[in-house]
Amino acid sequence: MSTTTTQKSSYTREDLLACAHGELFGPNNARLPLPNMLMMDRITHISDQGGKYGKGEIIAELDIHPDLWFFDCHFESDPVMPGCLGLDATWQLLGFFLGWVGNPGRGRALGVGNVKFSGQVLPTAKKLTYRIDLKRVISRKLVLGLADATVSVDGKDIYQADDLKVGLFTSTDGF
């Protein structure tokens, strides 16, 4: 699998919103969620080469500011970003990659082998960085992406997810 001239190696927030509206990969193909569930502001690098396994990589960022919606409700007087939102962002990015390389279908998170949380995202943080290292992409009747991910806040690794799985489905009727 190699990139084509229509693919970009980075995407702005406006590009990501276009993906959420079905304007990037087509209406019945991979989409990102809309805000508030869109958990990144930009993709700074995406490639089908490189990364830890030589199969591709994605680097994306979320700017942290104290007025993000989740700080008001998680938790009162102890605001912290829910770790599950960081995990969801890694699934979002893996699904984006599957659409970016040209696979059809709607993305669904299918699982993760192991997740470790070793830090937290507080309202005083500045930037969350997601790094996705592709391990394998199966592009047959079933489209499946397998990857590892690291999430860091202000340069410190705080989450590790191994064996993320996302599938693309041309029909989700039986799902």
Swiss-Prot record:
It comes from the Bacteria. The active site is at H74. One of its GO terms (biological process) is unsaturated fatty acid biosynthetic process. It is found in: Cytoplasm. Its EC number is 4.2.1.59, 5.3.3.14. Pathway: Lipid metabolism; fatty acid biosynthesis. InterPro entries: FabA, FabA_FabZ, HotDog_dom_sf. One of its GO terms (molecular function) is (3R)-hydroxyacyl-[acyl-carrier-protein] dehydratase activity. Keywords: Cytoplasm, Fatty acid biosynthesis, Fatty acid metabolism, Isomerase, Lipid biosynthesis, Lipid metabolism, Lyase. The keyword Isomerase applies. The keyword Lipid metabolism applies. It catalyses: a (3R)-hydroxyacyl-[ACP] = a (2E)-enoyl-[ACP] + H2O; (3R)-hydroxydecanoyl-[ACP] = (2E)-decenoyl-[ACP] + H2O; (2E)-decenoyl-[ACP] = (3Z)-decenoyl-[ACP]. GO terms for cellular component: cytoplasm. Gene3D superfamilies: Hotdog Thioesterase. Homodimer. Belongs to the thioester dehydratase family. FabA subfamily. Necessary for the introduction of cis unsaturation into fatty acids. Catalyzes the dehydration of (3R)-3-hydroxydecanoyl-ACP to E-(2)-decenoyl-ACP and then its isomerization to Z-(3)-decenoyl-ACP. Can catalyze the dehydratase reaction for beta-hydroxyacyl-ACPs with saturated chain lengths up to 16:0, being most active on intermediate chain length. This is 3-hydroxydecanoyl-[acyl-carrier-protein] dehydratase. It comes from Alcanivorax borkumensis (strain ATCC 700651 / DSM 11573 / NCIMB 13689 / SK2).
